[in-house]
């Protein structure tokens, strides 16, 4: 995971990404690259719930992990909120974010984010 304090990059846009999927063994988009416009995503919170036990994470369009891997039990979940000055940053500009997992099964994921240079 890479942490980038946003002091040098003023917030320009923010939003919420939501995904409900039956299978994330193939990464599924939660926010698309079209919304990025030469900026990085800074993730400020994550809520992830899963039906099947497995390992899950958020990655960019190039399959580079943005979060660590969450090893979750069946019907498990995780909730995470970043301190204001240390959000998780996507590694490169112009990349969307996807949810990926090691097993098929219903998942729900919500992230909050802002975009900045």
Language model region names:
Residues 1-42, 92-94, 100-117:
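C-terminal interaction-tip segments
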Residues 42-43, 82:
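Charged, amphipathic alpha-helical segments
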Residues 73-96, 100-103:
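Beta-sandwich interaction modules
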Residues 23-24, 67-84, 112-117:
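A signal for specific C-terminal beta-sheet/loop modules enriched in small/flexible residues
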Residues 51-70, 111:
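Short, surface-exposed beta-strand/strand-loop-strand elements in extracellular ectodomains
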């Amino acid at each position: 995971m890479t942490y980038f304090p946003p002091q040098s990059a003023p917030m320009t846009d923010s939003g919420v990404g939501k995904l409900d999927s039956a299978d994330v063994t193939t990464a599924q988009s939660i926010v698309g690259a079209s919304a990025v416009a030469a900026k990085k995503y800074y993730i400020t919170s994550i809520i992830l719930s899963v039906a099947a036990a497995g390992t899950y994470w958020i990655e960019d369009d190039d399959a580079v992990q943005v979060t660590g891997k969450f090893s979750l039990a069946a019907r498990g979940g995780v909730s995470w909120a970043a301190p204001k000055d240390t959000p998780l940053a996507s590694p490169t500009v112009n990349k969307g974010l996807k949810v990926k997992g090691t097993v098929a099964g219903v998942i729900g994921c919500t992230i909050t984010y802002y975009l900045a240079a």
